[in-house]
Amino acid sequence: MHRASHHELRAMFRALLDSSRCYHTASVFDPMSARIAADLGFECGILGGSVASLQVLAAPDFALITLSEFVEQATRIGRVARLPVIADADHGYGNALNVMRTVVELERAGIAALTIEDTLLPAQFGRKSTDLICVEEGVGKIRAALEARVDPALTIIARTNAELIDVDAVIQRTLAYQEAGADGICLVGVRDFAHLEAIAEHLHIPLMLVTYGNPQLRDDARLARLGVRIVVNGHAAYFAAIKATYDCLREERGAVASDLTASELSKKYTFPEEYQAWARDYMEVKE
């Protein structure tokens, strides 16, 4: 069986963006899940930053994972992947120069596309954990990412959060990233189709939507007409794996069945309340 090169996988992802359809990602978090996703016919996968933090550190999504740790996991996936994989590269692990290093390392790992978001990460002293960087810095990061890539087929996607700012600010940011040369725009926190339409009508590059299964955004044909090519529903496969592991080990120990959900198990073993308390105590981070 022919195994596509990393460049060929990137070209395959570009073809998805150039199509008129909407595709749903598989959540891939290790080589086995990447192989399963490809075998089941998924057109692309995504290595989420939150999932990588759970898989590598058993830690919540507080920007604790390092670039090296993330790249190591991406490399393991890239070694066996037979489908294009998107890397959720968070904020690029620092400033614009750090973004350049991030692009170099993830390209070498075999990633087909990556997202760079404009959230102020990691959380800063005395600031809200949901604050965004200024548009100018976000533009600088996208320009730096484009400069750093060697394979022109590698897709650079600018990500912003439509839930944290008003629609005019979202339009301002996404237009700026589009003008800076981003290959696509990733939107998180879109409420419904009216919200999406207000943003999408100003853009001419492909859209990626993180919906977390939002029932208000489940019409794939309508999404496709608005320019959405990639949809991320979340990472149910990973959390199902946590639940299955817990239940299996409980059974091996002779324990009675548990009714804890996958989400509850994740919180039970990653201690998010402790991290939140440390952020308040040592950094005066505002909720």
From Swiss-Prot:
Which positions are annotated as binding substrate? 50, 159, 235
Q: Which cofactor does it need?
A: Mg(2+)
| Record note on cofactor | Binds 1 Mg(2+) ion per subunit.
**EC code:** 4.1.1.112
Q: Cross-referenced SUPFAM superfamilies, in alphabetical order? A: Phosphoenolpyruvate/pyruvate domain (SSF51621)
According to its UniProt entry, the protein's GO biological process terms are: oxaloacetate metabolic process; propionate catabolic process, 2-methylcitrate cycle; pyruvate biosynthetic process
Task: Report the leader peptide range.
Answer: none
**What chemistry does it catalyse, as a reaction equation?**
oxaloacetate + H(+) = pyruvate + CO2
For the ligand (Mg(2+)), the binding residues are 88
What molecular function terms (GO) are annotated for this protein? magnesium ion binding; methylisocitrate lyase activity; oxaloacetate decarboxylase activity
Annotated Pfam families: PEP_mutase
Q: Which InterPro entries match?
A: ICL/PEPM (IPR039556), Oxaloacetate_deCOase_bac (IPR023687), Pyrv/PenolPyrv_kinase-like_dom (IPR015813), Pyrv_kinase-like_dom_sf (IPR040442)
Q: Write the record's keywords in alphabetical order, separated by commas.
A: Decarboxylase, Lyase, Magnesium, Metal-binding
Function field: Catalyzes the decarboxylation of oxaloacetate into pyruvate. Seems to play a role in maintaining cellular concentrations of bicarbonate and pyruvate.
Q: Which proteins does it associate with, and in what oligomeric form?
A: Homotetramer; dimer of dimers.
- Show the HAMAP family listed in the entry: OadC (MF_01299)
Query: Which protein family is named in the record?
Result: Belongs to the isocitrate lyase/PEP mutase superfamily. Oxaloacetate decarboxylase family.
Indicate what this protein is called per its UniProt record. Oxaloacetate decarboxylase
Question: What organism does this protein naturally occur in?
Answer: Pseudomonas paraeruginosa (strain DSM 24068 / PA7) (Pseudomonas aeruginosa (strain PA7))
